[in-house]
Amino acid sequence: MSEKNAYAKSGVDVEAGYEVVERIKKHVARTERAGVMGALGGFGGMFDLSKTGVREPVLVSGTDGVGTKLMLAIKYDKHDTIGQDCVAMCVNDIIAAGAEPLYFLDYVATGKNNPVKFEEVVSGVAEGCVQAGAALIGGETAEMPGMYGEDDYDLAGFAVGVAEKSQLIDGSKVKEGDILLGLASSGIHSNGYSLVRRVFADYTGKELLPELEGKQLKDVLLEPTRIYVRAALPLIKEELINGIGHITGGGFIENVPRMFADDLAAEIDEDKVPVLPIFKALEKYGDIKHEEMFEIFNMGVGLMLAVSPENVNRVKELLDEPVYEIGRIIKKADDSVVIK
């Protein structure tokens, strides 16, 4: 008995792994950028930091997954956008620190290697990298029979970006009187899906709920997370932004205070928040308290910017999209976020 056959009998298909690598090469090639060294398949991905032209470089890293949104991708057998979610969760955190994403690595673990499915997954990762301007320089697909079911998989990513030391965004520049500008989310993004799945547990996904404006439920639930790099990076380069909040798990209540010092607070005008239809549907069909929605979801704002009043018009000018003036920074009295 050959070693290959013995391994196959244990549930690991080495040939399928090789096929995945061949299938994803064309997707990885789309993400090429200046600074990438070496080719896919080496023991480690390499990047030449000098190619960025940054004078005082500070590396900023982030890692994340997509939570139980993966379970809906598996349920609806749609795998070509979940990779973008994974990239977005990592690079949006990096941009919130003022850094430009440079490269990304992904990790997929599964019970049975399916080359067609995982090509779809990596195609989504590559699309996310293209949108973020990051190179996909490495990754791992681990076949783990017994750990996962044959149709199950998990997905995680790791991103590294660079910032000029003087342009780092760490909350120290945010001050009382700053204006809070919201950039629209594309949907639920990648948080709160344990609750989302409970609310819609008995739905097929093909439903046309009146709140969803003619879209099938499954398409709305799997709408990929928006990547904010192209929008935010020019603002960072012009040093127009005092603080950035990536609105992820914990919604407004948990994430907005991460933008500023402990003696400040955010006053949010709820009427100016562009609440998306899916959040109205979740509140209605899930019987969720209205105030709790802001503790869980992004409510239609995926990225929040703290901007000095004199810079607001310039920021709006640079952003080729609707910009929502949803609040301001105030002195903290009790709560770090006050929703009016």
Swiss-Prot record:
Catalytic activity: 2-formamido-N(1)-(5-O-phospho-beta-D-ribosyl)acetamidine + ATP = 5-amino-1-(5-phospho-beta-D-ribosyl)imidazole + ADP + phosphate + H(+)
Enzyme class: ligase
SUPFAM superfamilies on file: PurM C-terminal domain-like, PurM N-terminal domain-like
Gene Ontology MF, one: phosphoribosylformylglycinamidine cyclo-ligase activity
CDD domains hit by this protein: PurM (cd02196)
Cellular localisation: Cytoplasm
GO biological process per UniProt: 'de novo' IMP biosynthetic process; adenine biosynthetic process
Pathway: Purine metabolism; IMP biosynthesis via de novo pathway; 5-amino-1-(5-phospho-D-ribosyl)imidazole from N(2)-formyl-N(1)-(5-phospho-D-ribosyl)glycinamide: step 2/2
Gene3D superfamilies membership: PurM-like C-terminal domain, PurM-like, N-terminal domain
Family to which the UniProt record says this protein belongs: Belongs to the AIR synthase family.
PANTHER family named among the record's database cross-references: TRIFUNCTIONAL PURINE BIOSYNTHETIC PROTEIN ADENOSINE-3 (PTHR10520:SF12), TRIFUNCTIONAL PURINE BIOSYNTHETIC PROTEIN ADENOSINE-3-RELATED (PTHR10520)
Protein name: Phosphoribosylformylglycinamidine cyclo-ligase
